[in-house]
């Protein structure tokens, strides 16, 4: 006579937490598997699906040093002086859209060093 799943579940539910931990360790050794690895593998694809690949850099405010921010905006966008000044003065405004995470973070860092308040979406 073999043991059913229900009988196993009943037996495990009657065990103390320490007994369950010992049971799991024994099963990992017996079958050469790790319970943590199975959880990580199951969670892996979900995280990959949620990861965003394109980011927008939004200038929230120019800050106290507007001239330095205008220079940073010109360098990042290739705009002329007047266009960059108008963009900075019209904050909040999108500086770049659909760029990689690394590029967005680098742009954010350079603008923040110039004194701007920046958001990456």
From Swiss-Prot:
A biological process term (GO) from this entry: translation
Gene3D superfamilies the UniProt entry points to: 3.30.1390.10, Single helix bin (1.20.5.710)
UniProt cross-references to Pfam families, sorted A to Z: Ribosomal_L12, Ribosomal_L12_N
Residue runs in coiled coils: none
Record-linked CDD domains: Ribosomal_L7_L12
Molecular function as annotated in GO: mRNA binding; structural constituent of ribosome
Gene Ontology cellular-component annotations: cytosolic large ribosomal subunit
Keyword annotations of the record: Ribonucleoprotein, Ribosomal protein
Entry's transmembrane regions: none
Family: Belongs to the bacterial ribosomal protein bL12 family.
Quaternary state and interactors: Homodimer. Part of the ribosomal stalk of the 50S ribosomal subunit. Forms a multimeric L10(L12)X complex, where L10 forms an elongated spine to which 2 to 4 L12 dimers bind in a sequential fashion. Binds GTP-bound translation factors.
Main function: Forms part of the ribosomal stalk which helps the ribosome interact with GTP-bound translation factors. Is thus essential for accurate translation.
Name used for this protein in its record: Large ribosomal subunit protein bL12
């Amino acid at each position: 006579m073999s043991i059913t799943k229900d009988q196993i579940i009943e037996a495990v539910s009657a065990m103390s937490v320490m007994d369950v931990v010992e049971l799991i360790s024994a099963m990992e050794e017996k079958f050469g598997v790790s319970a943590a690895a199975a959880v990580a593998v199951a969670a892996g694809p979900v995280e990959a699906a949620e990861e965003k690949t394109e980011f927008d850099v939004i200038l929230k405010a120019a800050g106290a040093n507007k001239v330095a921010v205008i220079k940073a905006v010109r360098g990042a966008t290739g705009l002329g002086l007047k266009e960059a000044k108008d963009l900075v003065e019209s904050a909040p405004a999108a500086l770049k859209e659909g760029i990689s995470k690394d590029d967005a973070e680098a742009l954010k860092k350079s603008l923040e060093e110039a004194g701007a308040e920046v958001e990456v979406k």
